Amino acid sequence: MTGGAQELLLSRIRDVPDYPQPGVVFKDITPLLADPEAFSVLTEALAEVCVRHGATKVVGLEARGFILGAPVAVRAGLGFIPIRKAGKLPGATLSQAYALEYGTAEIEVHAEDLTPDDRVMVIDDVLATGGTAAAAMELIRRGGADVAGLAVLMELGFLGGRARLEPTLAALEALLAL
């Protein structure tokens, strides 16, 4: 991705201080999504990552990973699979629990959506601690598919997600490092 494309994306991400709690600066991507040029640049860049790494399907993580992953899959000519919070998918699912700062959470996928022939690219808006991404990759592997990698719009490097994920991940690409 060119420097001009990165500048465009950065210019459309709004910092919201003290949200969702005091001391946190939330990275709001809604201005980027509202700008068709910026959203197209983002979609194209993530689709190129999928193609370059030989992905056959795209997984989007609830919730903003859905917003990014579905158009990326269409642009790359790939299928899209949502990974959702527990209890949100009907029918048979595989689930994976993971630790949060205070407690645990669980995500699910439809087992029949993954096959041994699949190379799955996980798409999300941000890489922070890597907990959700690690759980998603474990879930994909348990479903019998291969993980092609993780691609995100932005990485919050100070939270250590890359160090947590790199030992078990073939590819980890962040379009923006913040």
Swiss-Prot record:
It catalyses: AMP + diphosphate = 5-phospho-alpha-D-ribose 1-diphosphate + adenine. InterPro entries: Ade_phspho_trans, PRibTrfase_dom, PRTase-like, UPRTase/APRTase. The keyword Chaperone does not apply. GO terms for molecular function: adenine binding; adenine phosphoribosyltransferase activity; AMP binding. SUPFAM superfamilies: PRTase-like (SSF53271). One of its GO terms (cellular component) is cytoplasm. One of its GO terms (biological process) is AMP salvage. Its EC number is 2.4.2.7. Homodimer. Catalyzes a salvage reaction resulting in the formation of AMP, that is energically less costly than de novo synthesis. NCBIfam families: apt, PRK02304.1-3, PRK02304.1-5. This is Adenine phosphoribosyltransferase. It comes from Streptomyces clavuligerus. The gene is apt.
